């Protein structure tokens, strides 16, 4: 068995959540959150910010850590267990541009009820639900949007 670690972001701007549409030779299609593998020497925060920037061309800021998800998949002659660390993030605008080299063909910001139905994977739906609840709590107490640095 192979163990792998990735990091990603639930990016929210003005109440809408960033998602990417991936299409790889018609074998894999669906809306996903930006995430990717930790590179040597990187922290989880650095990985999450880099992946959001690379996959969606979004300058984001970390708000807080929101948890991790785990899933398994198979590769030829082995099983991979992947742990993904997720961060709630904010962006300073609605701009996004999908990374074609990674087979992303569309991207955009969607309302919670829209993205919840668009996302392909149930573990990402759960993370979005948790992140959105955090966002609503922070917004209601006036903490959302305070002192964020965009990377």
Regions inferred by a protein language model and the residue ranges of each:
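A small-molecule sensor/coupling module
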Residues: 126-132
